[in-house]
């Protein structure tokens, strides 16, 4: 009888140990999956950040004022982004410039062989600030959501004026406007999650 009780106690202890080991293994797997999700999403965020930080728009506007008080003005873009985010940045700037006061939003999926796809929601505000929300395209319990924010430098335009220059020309004013983003104004943070009650 005592042997039966010991056998029963040993079985119960074994069941508890087996349950704890299974739970621990599941938790380790979930931690590994969450860590991999974070590494994938944060790598995508850093890749986008670095490309945008190397991008800029430079526009030059030349206003020629004549001696009869008339003037002409021409504008041209002398520099524009060339990296893999160039299409996003150009579309965002064009939309913001066209629809003054409205933000531009677009979503893409970033794919790299051997890694999970990352969904990125790009928003350019009317002041050219950029917010990109990134997460695993497949979602899931171990998903990691990060927010990349880049603030536009807000540099004043460079203005130079040359007087004279011709028989009918009074002065030529060149205004150079630069839109760019600085590492000092770039952050990557976890997205705040609001729980539903």
Where are these regions (language model features)?
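Membrane-proximal N-terminal amphipathic helix
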Residues: 26-58
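Aliphatic-rich helix starts adjacent to a transmembrane/signal segment
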Residues: 5-39
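Conserved functional hotspots that engage anionic ligands or polymers and/or phospholipid headgroups
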Residues: 1-2, 50-197
């Amino acid at each position: 009888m005592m042997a039966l009780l010991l056998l029963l106690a040993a079985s119960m202890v074994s069941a508890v140990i087996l349950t704890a080991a299974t739970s621990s293994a599941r938790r380790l797997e979930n931690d590994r999956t969450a860590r991999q999700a974070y590494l994938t999403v944060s790598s995508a965020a850093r890749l986008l950040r670095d490309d945008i930080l190397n991008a800029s728009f430079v526009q030059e506007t030349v206003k020629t004022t004549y001696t009869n008080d008339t003037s002409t003005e021409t504008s041209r873009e002398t520099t524009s982004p060339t990296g893999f985010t160039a299409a996003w940045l150009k579309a965002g700037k064009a939309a913001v410039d066209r629809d003054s006061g409205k933000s531009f939003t677009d979503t893409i999926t970033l794919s790299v062989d051997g890694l999970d796809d990352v969904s990125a929601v790009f928003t350019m505000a009317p002041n050219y600030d950029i917010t990109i929300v990134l997460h695993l395209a497949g979602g899931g319990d171990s998903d990691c959501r990060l927010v990349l924010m880049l603030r536009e430098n807000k540099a004043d335009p460079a203005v130079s004026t040359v007087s004279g220059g011709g028989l009918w020309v009074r002065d030529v004013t060149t205004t150079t406007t630069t839109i760019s983003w600085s590492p000092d104004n770039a952050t990557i943070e976890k997205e705040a999650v609001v729980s539903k009650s």
